[in-house]
């Protein structure tokens, strides 16, 4: 069954619900969702959950504050008939502006990656060359706003996007290159905007899996 695409906010909430279940073993409450996302009221979280339910991503169970059941793991949105969307470019060196539209589709099933890939981004630069992410590669990305230390992430810093290895340390976030000639990007989220756009789950080079 084909499901409707999610808005950015709906995707953020869906990812948080999944992450909360994976890390705690139970769904979050509306209060916990509101606190995490920044809503002033749990009612706002409730409305977004209803939208997710209407689109077929979750089931809302009555009679409990944690009555949320995941129905889909985004696999169906990744594995569509057109293949994976190729969205803009990502700098693996100096960050460049992300292009927020689909340039084309690539004939590959996102479910072949683990976790599944939701889109592809073209790499520009060699800052991740030590781990085999090279200039011109297509980076398979699982769309999520949550990542662990050490994962290779697609991160938006202000209005630019880059691929780096994530490290959260104290109040700062370090985006480390895999190139000895380059320095990490250091972000203070108290004064700079940063958002995780996804985690790298694979690389396609010259039409072949890497």
From Swiss-Prot:
Oligomeric and partner information: Homodimer.
| InterPro entries in UniProt | LexA (IPR006200), LexA-like (IPR039418), LexA/Signal_pep-like_sf (IPR036286), LexA_DNA-bd_dom (IPR006199), LexA_repressor (IPR050077), Peptidase_S24_LexA (IPR006197), Peptidase_S24_S26A/B/C (IPR015927), WH-like_DNA-bd_sf (IPR036388)
Query: Which leading EC class covers this enzyme?
Result: hydrolase
Q: Which PANTHER family match?
A: LEXA REPRESSOR (PTHR33516), LEXA REPRESSOR-RELATED (PTHR33516:SF2)
| Keyword Cell division in record | no
What is the documented function of this protein?
A: Represses a number of genes involved in the response to DNA damage (SOS response), including recA and lexA. In the presence of single-stranded DNA, RecA interacts with LexA causing an autocatalytic cleavage which disrupts the DNA-binding part of LexA, leading to derepression of the SOS regulon and eventually DNA repair.
Q: Site (Cleavage): which residue positions?
A: 92-93
The name this protein goes by in its record: LexA repressor
Q: Which GO terms describe its biological process?
A: DNA repair; DNA replication; negative regulation of DNA-templated transcription; proteolysis; SOS response
Q: Which reaction does it catalyse?
A: Hydrolysis of Ala-|-Gly bond in repressor LexA
Question: Which part of the chain engages DNA, per the record?
Answer: 30-50
| A Pfam family hit | Peptidase_S24
Bilayer-crossing residues are none
């Amino acid at each position: 069954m084909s499901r409707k695409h999610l808005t950015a906010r709906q995707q953020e909430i869906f990812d948080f619900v999944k992450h909360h279940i994976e890390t705690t073993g139970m769904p979050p409450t509306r209060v916990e969702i509101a606190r995490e996302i920044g809503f002033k009221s749990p009612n706002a979280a409730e409305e977004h959950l209803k939208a997710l339910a209407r689109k077929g991503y979750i089931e809302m169970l009555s009679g409990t504050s944690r009555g949320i059941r995941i129905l889909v793991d985004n696999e169906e949105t990744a594995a569509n008939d057109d293949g994976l969307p190729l969205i803009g470019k990502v700098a693996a060196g100096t960050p460049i502006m992300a292009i927020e539209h689909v340039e084309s589709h690539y004939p590959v099933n996102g479910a072949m990656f683990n976790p599944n890939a939701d889109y592809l981004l073209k790499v520009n630069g060699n800052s991740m060359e030590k781990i085999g992410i090279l200039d011109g590669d297509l980076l398979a990305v699982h769309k999520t706003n949550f990542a662990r230390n050490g994962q290779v992430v697609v991160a938006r810093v202000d209005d630019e996007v880059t691929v780096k290895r994530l490290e959260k340390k104290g109040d700062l976030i370090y985006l480390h290159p895999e190139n000895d000639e380059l320095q990490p990007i250091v972000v203070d989220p108290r004064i700079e905007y940063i958002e995780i756009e996804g985690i790298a789950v694979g690389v396609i080079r010259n039409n072949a899996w890497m």
